[in-house]
């Protein structure tokens, strides 16, 4: 099978316009608690039926399919429909590790934006600034360079640096304090 189908959120189908790696774009249905609330089981049943019908057309009944990160009820439902379920995390991660020239350009651009953002952050360190204010300098600098969001707010100061993995907060930075940043 050479076709690549992108199931996109309703109203976002246009985002794939012009991508030569996508054969067709279809509106996705969502089976998450956020989208479905207490009706999640009904949404999961609809999702199972829709994707099961599609899979039977594309690869046949009782085919082996790889799944990465899917609701347990959906995996069970697809098994009940006769599909053989395999964990696809390993092959998916190995495939993600291979980078094209375009991806390498994006990574390089991201690193430049991050380095420039960290430089701006370092210049903004002063007693009395809150961790949140200091964090916002990094985020603003990265976005101003057409970068993307910062995923985890791992900047802390003083006693908050140990134990590690405490997110940025309203704490005011004091003179001669250690400031820890994880990019």
Positions of PLM-derived features:
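A composition/biophysics-driven feature that prefers long, compositionally simple stretches
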Residues: 1-113
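A short, terminal or domain-edge coil/loop segment
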Residues: 17-34, 120-122, 142-148, 176-183
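Generic preference for flexible, low-structure residues
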Residues: 20-23, 41, 81, 101, ...
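Short catalytic-site patches enriched in acidic/histidine residues
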Residues: 74, 87-94, 98, 129-183
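Active-site pocket-lining segments that scaffold enzyme catalytic pockets across diverse folds
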Residues: 111-119, 131
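C-terminal helix-coil-helix/basic helical segment that borders enzyme active sites and/or dimer interfaces
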Residues: 122-129
């Amino acid at each position: 099978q050479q076709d690549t189908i992108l199931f996109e959120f309703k109203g976002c189908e246009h985002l794939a316009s012009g991508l030569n790696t996508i054969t067709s774009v279809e509106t996705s249905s969502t089976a998450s608690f956020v989208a479905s609330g207490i009706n999640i089981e009904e949404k999961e049943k609809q999702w199972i039926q829709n994707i099961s019908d599609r899979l039977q057309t594309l690869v046949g009944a009782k085919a082996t399919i790889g799944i990465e990160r899917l609701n347990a009820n959906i995996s069970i439902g697809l098994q009940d429909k006769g599909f053989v379920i395999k964990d696809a995390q390993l092959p998916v991660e190995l495939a993600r590790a291979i980078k094209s020239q375009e991806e390498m350009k994006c990574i390089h651009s991201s690193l430049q934006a991050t380095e420039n953002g960290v430089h701006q952050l370092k210049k903004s360190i002063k007693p009395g600034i809150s961790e949140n204010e200091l964090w916002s300098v990094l985020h603003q600098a990265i976005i101003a360079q057409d970068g993307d969001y910062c995923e985890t707010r791992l900047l802390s100061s003083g006693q908050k640096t140990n134990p590690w993995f405490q997110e940025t907060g309203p704490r005011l930075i004091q003179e001669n304090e250690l400031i820890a940043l994880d990019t």
